[in-house]
Amino acid sequence: MSDGRGNLELDVSRETLERLMVFSEVLKKWNPKINLVSRKSIDDLWTRHILDSIQVFDAAPEGGAWLDIGSGGGLPGIIVAILAAEKSPDTRITLMESDLRKCAFLRNAARECGVSVTVKSKRIESAPEENCDVLSARALADLDNLLGFAERHLAENGTAMFPKGANWKKEVDNARKRWRFECDEITSVTEPGAVILKIKGVERV
């Protein structure tokens, strides 16, 4: 039976690959009930979503406390937890999601994959400050709003990891009207013109 990866080659251990495969099956099982990812993209789950999440982990600093906000379908949060179990076991991962059904999915997916995460059912803008070392968000909001969440939840020397599509330059220019920040753009391997924005030093203008 096909696992949906096609010819995709991943530089991970057999155990990590097995966990990723378990995650893909759990997501496909839950998706019709609570729409974790679009039906259009579910057939391209490995390259569109899983590989996209892997590159976020690979570009981020190692260790410390990692907060994924608007975790929804566990992308990148559960993928980060799967990779960290092998490559960075000291990383403490928190997934923040306001939808209770999606929180139930996240807990189930973590359990099925055998990884440790803390799932918090809270609204990002009103949750207590997390003081995390790494903050990630995927397909959640525009950069201006994401930087507001980063200012609230990142530790002083923390790093934000935000995958963005081909219009990322406009988002950066717009965000600079209200924010000062250092930004590295890492070219995405999953979508032409897309990047991962690696951001530090967030403060209001």
Curated annotation (Swiss-Prot):
Disulfide bonds: none annotated. GO terms for molecular function: rRNA (guanine-N7-)-methyltransferase activity. Its EC number is 2.1.1.170. It catalyses: guanosine(527) in 16S rRNA + S-adenosyl-L-methionine = N(7)-methylguanosine(527) in 16S rRNA + S-adenosyl-L-homocysteine. InterPro entries: rRNA_ssu_MeTfrase_G (IPR003682), SAM-dependent_MTases_sf (IPR029063). Keywords: Cytoplasm, Methyltransferase, rRNA processing, S-adenosyl-L-methionine, Transferase. It holds the Pfam family GidB. This is Ribosomal RNA small subunit methyltransferase G. It comes from Ruegeria sp. (strain TM1040).
